[in-house]
Curated annotation (Swiss-Prot):
Residues 244-392 are cytoplasmic. The keyword DNA-binding does not apply. May play an immunosuppressive role by inhibiting lymphocyte proliferation and subsequently facilitating viral replication and generalization of infection. Responsible for viral hemadsorption, which may help viral spread. Increases virus replication in the tick vector at the step of virus uptake or replication in the tick gut. May play a role in the host Golgi reorganization to yield viral factories. May play a role in host cell penetration. Residues 258-290, 328-357 are annotated as: Disordered. Cleaved into two fragments of 63 kDa and 26 kDa containing respectively the glycosylated N-terminus and the nonglycosylated C-terminus. A full-length 89-kDa glycosylated form also exists. This is CD2 homolog. Residues 17-222 are extracellular. InterPro entries: Ig-like_dom_sf, Ig-like_fold. Disulfide bonds join 137-205, 144-188. Residues 1-16 form the signal peptide.
Length: 392
């Protein structure tokens, strides 16, 4: 055991001294990729054929770090400085990895011996899920995209015939529009070493021309409605401007007509002399037209006298009215006429006794009705009085 430790120490010293000088002379033997599931175990072969060899295992995590130092003699390999929780080294100096931690994946493990270097990259293998199919009838293209999974292969099948495949994440395929019909079935298959999945879709490109026409008509209708909206807005703006201009012009004309002409001083003096009397026009006085009404433009034109225009000034205040005349005192009411004396009541008429009633007249005797000879007397007949009355 002591001899083994001395041999390993000497090997480490020699390796550290000659590593820089021999590194440029080493030959990279191979780069190998492994796709492994979580919780699996993998063994990286050392490929050592000589009887006596010095071996070192490294792992790459941004930089290469020493994992273990081994020495092989005959069929025995002794190593040190490695974690037995995740790793184990066989008698051939091969490295066994227990993939129970995610940090062990996507890592490169390197073995160095003699003048050879082998790089092993461990990748995590994820199961696949159904792919996604998309197509464009106008460009005659089909796309098949991976949704999930690692180390995958994608196959494209048209009408149950595989036409192309790839190991990339997306498969693009341009088909011949003149050869294929407008209706066909597309199947996209994706798989890896642990799972497989597929998606099938029926493609119908018969209505591509109709859909393009519909898109054109839709855009045209949008443009048409936009033009109508713009033209309508411009027309309404022009009409509002014209109506506003005519209204302002008409109002200005009415104000010019309603404004009174300048009056002379004689008319003012005359108004001061007698404000209560109304000036009677003379036959020679001109008559001015009455201003137009703002609400009735088709009514006949009336004329007013010049002297009365002073009464319609908007800025002149009316003269105060004279005080009202006092009301005359009310006339006294005449005395009421005396009532005439009441007439005496006439004496009551004397009561006359009622006349005695005359005695009742005797009823006439009933005539005797002779009975027929064949009818027996009433005493012998069994006839009720009611029946007799009915017979009578």
């Amino acid at each position: 055991m002591i001899i083994k430790l001395i041999f390993l120490i000497c090997f480490k010293i020699v390796l550290s001294i000659d590593n820089k000088t021999k590194f440029n002379e080493t030959l990279i033997l191979d780069n190998i990729d492994y796709w492994v599931k979580f919780n699996d175990t993998i063994t990286l072969d050392s490929n050592i054929t000589s009887e006596i060899e010095a071996v070192s295992w490294n792992f790459y995590n941004n930089t290469f770090n020493l994992l273990a130092i081994c020495g092989k003699a005959s069929n025995f390999c002794s190593c040190s400085n490695y974690s037995t929780s995740f790793f184990n080294i066989t008698n051939n100096c091969s490295l066994t990895i227990f993939l129970i931690d995610e940090t062990l994946f996507n890592t490169t493990y390197q073995i160095v011996y003699s003048t050879n270097i082998i790089n092993y990259k461990i990748n995590l293998l994820i199961p696949v899920t159904p792919p996604i199919i998309s197509y464009n009838c106008a460009n005659c293209s089909i796309n098949c995209k991976k949704s999930n999974g690692t180390n995958t292969n994608i196959f494209l099948s048209i009408n149950d015939t595989i036409v192309t495949y790839t190991n990339e994440s997306i498969l693009n395929y341009d088909y011949n529009c003149s050869i294929l019909n407008n209706n066909f079935t597309v199947t996209c298959i994706i798989n890896n070493t642990i799972s497989t999945s597929n998606t099938t879709e029926f493609i119908n490109c018969t209505n591509i021309l109709l859909s393009s026409y519909l898109d054109f008509f839709q855009v045209t209708s949008y443009i048409f409605y936009m033009i109508i909206f713009i033209v309508t807005g411009i027309t309404v703006s022009i009409l509002i401007s014209i109506i506003t201009f005519l209204f302002i012009r008409k109002r200005k004309h009415v104000e010019e007509i309603e404004s009174p002409p300048p009056e002379s001083n004689e008319e003012e003096q005359q108004c001061h002399h007698d404000t209560t009397s109304i000036h009677e026009p003379s036959p020679r006085e001109p008559l001015l037209p009455k201003p137009y009404s703002r609400y009735q433009y088709n009514t006949p034109i009336y004329y007013m006298r010049p002297s009365t225009q002073q009464l319609f000034k908007s800025y002149s205040l009316p003269k105060p009215c004279p005080p009202p005349k006092p009301c005359p005192p009310p006339k006294p009411c005449p005395p009421p006429k005396p009532c005439p004396p009441s007439k005496p009541c006439p004496p009551p008429e004397p009561y006359s006794p009622p006349k005695p009633c005359p005695p009742p007249k005797p009823y006439p005797s009933l005539p005797s009705i002779p009975l027929p000879p064949d009818i027996p007397p009433l005493s012998t007949q069994n006839i009720s009085l009611i029946h007799v009355d009915r017979i009578i």
